[in-house]
Curated annotation (Swiss-Prot):
S-adenosyl-L-methionine binds at G112, I132, G133, D134, Y135, V136, L137. Coiled coil: none annotated. This is tRNA (guanine-N(1)-)-methyltransferase. Belongs to the RNA methyltransferase TrmD family. Keywords: Cytoplasm, Methyltransferase, S-adenosyl-L-methionine, Transferase, tRNA processing. The gene is trmD. GO terms for biological process: tRNA N1-guanine methylation. Homodimer. It comes from the Bacteria. One of its GO terms (molecular function) is tRNA (guanine(37)-N1)-methyltransferase activity.
Length: 232
């Protein structure tokens, strides 16, 4: 699986993507990271990549001509790549969208900066806009890392224990509480059922705990899974 990242801060990568399981998988060639410096496509003395928005307003926008040259370079190397743009106005990047993204062998992520990018770039290249949450970041690099992390960990061989992927959160409910040694800590005991060895009862406890946490913290997930009336 190949990821191409377009950014004005190439030094940010691989960053956290270069450590732990993902870093080892990167070194083994289970996935590939190509970083493109947008400033290299500025074609001007000062490597200027931004300009003021037409119609006025605060901040600066990444220029269409600069981004266009960068994207065209990527497309010349990877003509079948999926083009994505990290944007606070994009669709929420969920586990389902991550799985859909995994249908592509090559993915390109354009990282926004300043007040955004010229809208013509989105329209011309038909960029899929994705958001990792209802908040504003200084740039799209961190969002790109989140997206890459979410996808790469589903690549076979990246996560050592494949069973971990099957028990992941966000499958319609949040994860149940987990405990390890010592069994007693600061007067707090591990739930007795987890010490019984009765796998049927343990599974039942975990399922109920998961549903309780989800109902309290993310009832929207249960409504999506079971419907409005069943949750209430």
């Amino acid at each position: 699986m190949i990821f191409n990242v377009l950014t004005i801060f190439p030094q940010m990568f691989p960053g956290p993507l270069g450590v732990s399981n993902l870093g080892s998988a990167l070194k083994k060639g289970l996935w590939t990271l190509n970083v493109f410096d947008i400033r290299a496509f500025a074609n001007n003395k000062h490597n200027t990549v931004d300009d003021t928005p037409y119609g006025g307003g605060p901040g600066m926008l990444l220029r269409a001509d600069v981004l266009g040259r960068c994207i065209d370079e990527v497309l010349s190397l990877h003509p079948n790549t999926k083009l994505m743009f990290t944007s606070p106005r994009g669709v929420s990047f969920t586990q389902d969208i991550a799985r859909q993204t995994m249908n592509f062998d090559n993915i390109t992520l354009l990282c926004g900066r300043f007040e955004g990018i010229d809208e013509r770039v989105v329209d011309f290249y038909k960029l899929q806009e994705v958001s990792i949450g209802d908040y504003v970041l200084s740039g799209g690099e961190l969002a790109a890392m989140v997206i890459i992390d979410t996808c790469v960990r589903m690549v076979p061989g990246v996560i050592g224990n494949a069973e971990s992927l099957k028990q992941e959160s966000m499958e319609g409910s949040l994860e149940y509480p987990q405990y390890t040694r010592p069994a007693s800590w600061k007067g707090m005991e591990v739930p007795e059922v987890l010490l019984t060895g009765n796998h049927g009862e343990i599974e039942k406890w975990r399922r109920n705990a998961s549903l309780s946490i989800t109902a309290a913290r993310r009832p929207d997930l249960l409504k999506d899974r079971y419907g409005e009336n069943d949750v209430e």
